[in-house]
Swiss-Prot record:
Keywords tagged on the record: Endosome, Glycoprotein, Membrane, Protein transport, Signal-anchor, Transmembrane, Transmembrane helix, Transport, Vacuole
Ranges for region Disordered: 383-427, 440-529
InterPro entries for this protein: B30.2/SPRY (IPR001870), B30.2/SPRY_sf (IPR043136), ConA-like_dom_sf (IPR013320), SPRY_dom (IPR003877), SPRY_Ssh4-like (IPR035780)
Lumenal face of the membrane: 24-529
Amino acid composition bias (Polar residues), ranges on this chain: 383-398, 457-476, 492-504
Gene expressing this chain: SSH4
Residues carrying sugar: N157, N182, N211, N344, N390, N439, N458, N492, N503, N506
Organism (species): Debaryomyces hansenii (strain ATCC 36239 / CBS 767 / BCRC 21394 / JCM 1990 / NBRC 0083 / IGC 2968) (Yeast)
Segments of skewed composition (Basic residues): 511-529
Protein name (database record): Protein SSH4
Stated role: Components of the endosome-vacuole trafficking pathway that regulates nutrient transport. May be involved in processes which determine whether plasma membrane proteins are degraded or routed to the plasma membrane.
Residues in compartment: Cytoplasmic: 1-2
Subcellular location: Vacuole membrane; Endosome membrane
Occurrences of domain B30.2/SPRY (ranges): 101-309
Family in the record: Belongs to the SSH4 family.
């Protein structure tokens, strides 16, 4: 081999080896040296992404118990603490549900269909002695929770929606303290607003007291997985050493907001429309909004994005759970698709639903018949445009039969129908009306006067019906010719109109006499047979 190649390979391997040694030394001596930086639990510890600093082991809990004088607590508070620790051991938090893994496929489909209406706070499990009621999905009313040591917490049914938020990487919600009595009447009244993991002992613990949870308490304390100080320890007056007062105390009409940045796992708190502080970073577990009360009745209203936020930045950047108004800001599979904007022409051009409306015009019902037994399609008014005259549509056979049954007319060819109506004088219109009535009622009265033979052969009956049909056809022909003559000549005097009427009556009399003669001959033939 060429010695130059061997030398090049040796130099390359030595450089790579030196780089590996340098990187390993940097990770050992420099990694995580900053005290303010949060470290993460690796796969060897619970396999989750939770800040190690806020997790309490048994040694830390014993230290907290001794620090806050656990032995001098009331029996109820001691029992609540021991019961909470037992619940955590038997039902540990599911730290594997990270970055939206708590959502199943069915949950994702439900959020697509219902949007923000899919979120609601869970009702109290004890229906008979319920301590709170959830109204309108996001209004929580604690009404039977004013007894000593009574504790209850309501949790949202779904965790924070952190998936498929490409353009809005922050989830935010606000809670308004609608009603809360605090003072001499209720000195131990206490509530907490925050985030918890499931399962959580909501029947007897407030948010922030068990792993893993965080809460903003009404006394101003910030609780992160710490069972101490207890609520009663925080109500020992202004000189109490347990009131840290990290945050401003909460009262009625205050609005508390919690935000979560999906990309960095940062949790922050707002109060009355102003950002207060960032609580932690690097928390990627699925958290559920929760509201709890201790020995007090209160009413809370939670805003998940269905209304405008008090914190203006959340409105501008669309930090709500699911955006219904601006789907483009929160792109992805979750959320409701925006309805077509009918007022915007640029949007309507590319909308397939609106384009189909032009291709498929609606079918309106047929117009009603006028006094003369014709629809508006058969009438051609003088002065109408040529376009409207050309727009004539043929009726189907069923429609023709229905019209003929309604009018009581026999079938007449459409060529013989008069479709032109002009501004004729009243005398001509009266004549038209009389002729039309005679045309309708005449054949019926004649046929009814000449009854069909009750007893006879089939030939005699057929001859009778043939004669009746010929009589009606001749009658129709005569009346139509007379009507055409009247409309063409347009008589200007009443004398001409009376003459036309007399001629018509004479014609009808002659036709009747002819029919009677024919019928008599036919009856004589039948008798001879």
């Amino acid at each position: 081999m060429d010695p130059a190649i061997i030398l090049f390979v040796f130099i390359f391997v030595s450089v790579c080896f030196c780089l590996l040694i340098f990187l390993s030394a940097y990770r050992v001596f420099s990694g995580g040296s900053e005290r303010n930086e949060y470290s993460f639990l690796g796969s060897e510890i619970l396999g989750s992404e939770v800040p190690r600093e806020f997790l309490n082991d048994e040694e830390a809990l014993n230290h907290l118990a001794s620090e806050y004088d656990f032995t001098h607590l009331s029996p109820e508070e001691q029992f609540s603490y021991l019961r909470g620790e037992e619940f955590t051991k038997t039902n540990p938090p599911n730290f594997h549900n990270t970055r939206g893994k708590s959502y199943s496929n069915e949950d994702d489909m439900l959020l697509k269909e219902r949007g923000i209406n899919a979120f609601e706070f869970e009702q109290d499990a004890d229906i008979l002695r319920g301590r709170y009621i959830v109204a309108d999905k996001t209004e929580i009313n604690f009404h039977n929770n004013d007894t000593p040591y009574s504790t209850a917490t309501s949790i949202l049914n779904y965790s924070l929606p952190v998936k498929n938020r490409a353009y809005s990487d922050t989830v935010y919600f606000e809670v308004k303290v609608f009603e809360f009595q605090n003072g001499s009447e209720n000195p131990n009244g206490h509530f907490a607003i925050g985030l918890v993991t499931k399962p959580y002992p909501s029947d007897f613990r407030l948010p922030g007291y068990n792993n893993f949870s965080i809460a903003y308490e009404s006394t101003g304390n910030l609780k992160i997985n710490k069972p101490f100080p207890t609520p009663l320890q925080q109500h020992q007056g202004d000189n109490s050493q347990y009131n840290a007062l990290v945050l401003p105390p909460l009262q009625q009409s205050d609005i508390v907001g919690f935000g979560y940045v999906v990309s960095t796992g940062t949790l922050f708190i707002t109060r009355n429309g102003k950002k207060v502080m960032d609580v932690m970073r690097g928390c990627f577990i699925d958290l559920y909004p929760a509201v709890g009360c201790f020995s007090s009745n209160a009413k809370f209203q939670v805003n998940l994005g269905q209304l405008g936020f008090v914190w203006i930045e959340a409105n501008v950047r669309k930090y709500g759970f699911v955006s219904n108004s601006d789907y483009k800001k929160i792109k992805g599979e979750q959320g409701l698709a925006a309805l077509p904007e009918y007022g915007n022409s640029s949007v309507a051009e590319g909308d397939k639903l609106l384009e189909m409306g032009e291709e498929l015009p609606p079918r309106y019902p047929e117009d009603e018949l006028d006094f003369f037994g014709r629809s508006s399609k058969d009438i051609l008014k003088v002065g109408s445009s040529s376009k409207s005259q050309n727009k004539t549509k043929s009726f189907s056979n069923n429609e023709k039969q229905d019209l003929e049954e309604i009018n009581g007319e026999p079938k007449v060819a459409e060529e013989h129908r008069s479709s032109l109506i002009t501004d004729d004088p009243e005398e001509v219109m009266d004549l038209r009306e009389r002729l039309y009535e005679q045309n309708i009622t005449g054949p019926v009265s004649e046929l009814s006067s000449e009854r069909a033979p009750l007893i006879g052969n089939n030939e005699s009956q057929s001859e009778f019906y043939v004669n009746a049909k010929s009589a009606t056809s001749s009658r129709e022909g005569n009346t139509e010719t007379d009507l055409k003559q009247v409309t063409d000549e347009e008589p200007n005097s009443s004398q001409e109109l009376t003459k036309a009427a007399q001629n018509d009556s004479n014609i009808s009399k002659t036709s009747r006499t002819k029919k009677k003669k024919k019928n008599k001959k036919n009856s004589k033939k039948n008798k001879k047979k």
